[in-house]
């Protein structure tokens, strides 16, 4: 399971990141938008790593969203 950390910025935007995948961070106008974007980006990063024979964190097919 990959953890998604999410927080609200001072300007009202939401930021979501996956700590186990450095650089996987997105913004959204809503919490849901930020989470959906970061999940999609994380899956693309994992697929790219697999395609290039790189190691990936041991994960299931789920994300755990934490405030």
Show which residues each predicted segment covers.
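Short, charged, surface-exposed hinge/linker loops at domain edges
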Residues: 1-3, 32, 36-67
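Hydrophobic residues in alpha-helical membrane-spanning segments
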Residues: 20-23, 58
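A short, exposed loop/beta-hairpin motif centered on an aromatic-Gly-Thr core
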Residues: 22-33
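Short aromatic-glycine-(Arg/Gly/Cys) micro-motifs in beta-strand/loop hairpins
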Residues: 7-21
